[in-house]
């Protein structure tokens, strides 16, 4: 995911300050995620959870999702409307998919990440982290498509 981010940053970097800030926030989220999942290199063994890493990831996750929905997507849809009906329609579809993705991630957050982690739910927590990683990868692909639609036209 960091390689994908690097490619997109090189593609659009410097052309739009808002996008640059967004991509930097994505990088911070990915670093926090990798730090958190890297804490348990042996998935079979129970190890102590770094609560600070979990808190950092959760804060970055909520901030990233909120910024996208309440700030960036709206601006991108407005920008798409200035290009063409086709770009606007595709961007609107992407926005709908992103809303569904946010709901999926927040369901994981509410049911697994925000709860206390102990021996009984450690495996479930690790599976939830993996699912969040997959959902983030899907989200980044959707966001990248939206960025390209708006800024290629």
From Swiss-Prot:
Domain of life of the native organism: Bacteria
Compartment(s) of residence: Cytoplasm
InterPro entries documented for this protein: Rsd/AlgQ_sf, Sigma70_reg_Rsd, Sigma70_reg_Rsd_AlgQ
Keyword Nucleotide-binding appears in the UniProt entry: no
Any one Pfam family match given in the protein's UniProt record, by short name: Rsd_AlgQ
Keyword Cytoplasm on entry: yes
GO cellular-component term (any): cytoplasm
Single Gene Ontology BP annotation: regulation of DNA-templated transcription
Keyword annotations: Cytoplasm, Transcription, Transcription regulation
HAMAP family: Rsd
Function: Binds RpoD and negatively regulates RpoD-mediated transcription activation by preventing the interaction between the primary sigma factor RpoD with the catalytic core of the RNA polymerase and with promoter DNA. May be involved in replacement of the RNA polymerase sigma subunit from RpoD to RpoS during the transition from exponential growth to the stationary phase.
Summary of subunit composition and partner proteins: Interacts with RpoD.
Family per similarity comment: Belongs to the Rsd/AlgQ family.
Name the UniProt record assigns to this protein: Regulator of sigma D
Designated gene of the protein: rsd
């Amino acid at each position: 995911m960091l390689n994908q981010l690097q490619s997109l940053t090189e593609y659009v970097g410097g052309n739009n300050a808002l996008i640059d800030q967004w991509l930097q926030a994505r990088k911070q989220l990915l670093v926090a995620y990798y730090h958190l999942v890297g804490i348990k290199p042996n998935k079979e063994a129970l190890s102590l959870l770094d609560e600070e890493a979990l808190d950092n990831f959760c804060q970055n996750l909520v901030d990233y999702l909120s910024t996208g929905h309440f700030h960036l997507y709206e601006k991108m849809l407005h920008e798409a409307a200035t290009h063409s009906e086709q770009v606007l329609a595709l961007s609107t579809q992407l926005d709908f998919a992103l809303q569904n993705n946010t709901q999926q991630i927040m369901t994981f957050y509410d049911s697994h990440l925000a709860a206390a982690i102990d021996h009984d739910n450690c495996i479930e927590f690790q599976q939830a982290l993996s699912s969040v990683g997959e959902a983030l990868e899907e989200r980044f692909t959707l966001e990248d498509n939206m960025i390209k639609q708006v800024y290629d036209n």
